[in-house]
Amino acid sequence: MKTSHLIRITLPGALAAALLASQVSQAADLVPPPGYYAAVGERKGSAGSCPSVPPPYTGSLVFTSKYEGSDSARATLNAKAEKAFRSQIKDITDMERGATKLVTQYMRSGRDGDLVCALNWMSAWARAGALQSDDFNHTGKSMRKWALGSLSGAYMRLKFSSSRPLSAHAGQSREIEDWFARLGTQVVRDWSNLPLKKINNHSYWAAWSVMSTAVVTNRRDLFDWAVSEFKVAANQVDEQGFLPNELKRRQRALAYHNYALPPLAMIAAFAQVNGVDLRQENHGALQRLAERVMNGVDDEETFEEKTGEDQDMTDLKVDNKYAWLEPYCALYRCAPKMLEAKKDREPFNSFRLGGEVTRVFSREGGS
């Protein structure tokens, strides 16, 4: 009798198994790549004094564009406008850079003072409701998503470290994560439902900030949105590996193709460890884009032919602009030439990706 009962409930075996797998996948906690579980370094010396928290930015997010007055290519900087922009966003960038630096110092040295300082900085901004203004322009909502990616990416190292540094700071952790969740929800509103002609690297960076926030706050809805935005991006990559909306940047087209890669590679790496393989989206679009960029760095002629402009290589001479190579080469078996390019530029440290990218994707870090 028991046997027949078992047979009856297992008759639709394949369907039942598929449904069960789907339910388990949906129920599973979101996780980062393995390197984020790295233990805190052994304590070395004592922490210095905690710098003053940058004033929480609670004002309007209407900022001057550094390209103000430029034509539709948005490729020529306006020095006067850029100076105004840098002044307007100083507290935000000080917060991004400073908090990321404090987390990095703590993870390296294990000095409790650095941890306490980093958490005090973030909780101060959380309690103030910083960066939540509904009054914003394109530049302002761009700053919101960049800051969220920087701060949640750095905080993630504390959240998932096997040393459990946040265990004694439950109240502050809850404040900070609730703030990240509010910002993540706002970033989704800011960057949803754009026409394809308006979707470019900004949307990709927004998706990275939401992916990072999704993992920190275990929000499956945010994770799904980030994945959907990646798919839009992947389907913008043409057969030759170009992004048409970045080709519009003319002399900065190659630089902006490269700038599109860090958020996309990070999203793909985070999706992969959560059971979503994005590598084959649009017939391997991410790989086509990466190879097009690295070929362009070696010889920009193809970009010059596409845009009719000599390429501005200034940004491409900065090693950290290639931080995307770490998550990318964790996803793909990188060719020797690409591995050599990565090795020549390491270690990568990008505050917009949460700090020490090489460390969290290195074999020593656990990946």
UniProtKB/Swiss-Prot annotation:
Q: State the Gene Ontology BP annotations.
A: alginic acid catabolic process
What terms describe the molecular function in GO for this protein?
poly(beta-D-mannuronate) lyase activity
UniProt xrefs under SUPFAM superfamilies: Chondroitin AC/alginate lyase
Keyword Signal in the entry? The reply is: yes
Hey, which family's this protein in?
A: Belongs to the polysaccharide lyase 5 family.
- Organism expressing this protein natively: Pseudomonas paraeruginosa (strain DSM 24068 / PA7) (Pseudomonas aeruginosa (strain PA7))
Primary site of residence: periplasm
Localization: Periplasm
Protein name, please?
Alginate lyase
